[in-house]
């Protein structure tokens, strides 16, 4: 499958509200981190998912129980440059600042490299 081998960057909108429905208040932000990792693993097909510190701050901005309903994410599939890496690729997830995350479509971001 050639599609999984290439390096790509996409922007997604994740609806955390439906993923955190029914989760107790003191576990909402930690569960949001787990759900974002699961989302990135599903869409990028990599087991190694890394979150940007800015994304962690965006999740925890309103405290443990005040997680945003929707977040706009930029997920990049990159090559693992480490010598003894278990996986050849990893996903890097970072937040995108938008006024409102409602109604936005998934977009492939062109890299200027």
Curated annotation (Swiss-Prot):
Single Gene Ontology MF annotation: structural constituent of ribosome
Pfam families per record: Ribosomal_L31e
Keyword Ribonucleoprotein: yes
CDD domains xref list: Ribosomal_L31e
Function comment: Component of the ribosome, a large ribonucleoprotein complex responsible for the synthesis of proteins in the cell. The small ribosomal subunit (SSU) binds messenger RNAs (mRNAs) and translates the encoded message by selecting cognate aminoacyl-transfer RNA (tRNA) molecules. The large subunit (LSU) contains the ribosomal catalytic site termed the peptidyl transferase center (PTC), which catalyzes the formation of peptide bonds, thereby polymerizing the amino acids delivered by tRNAs into a polypeptide chain.
Family assignment from sequence similarity: Belongs to the eukaryotic ribosomal protein eL31 family.
PANTHER family on file: 60S RIBOSOMAL PROTEIN L31
Miscellaneous comment in the UniProt entry for this protein: There are 2 genes for eL31 in yeast.
Protein name, entry field: Large ribosomal subunit protein eL31A
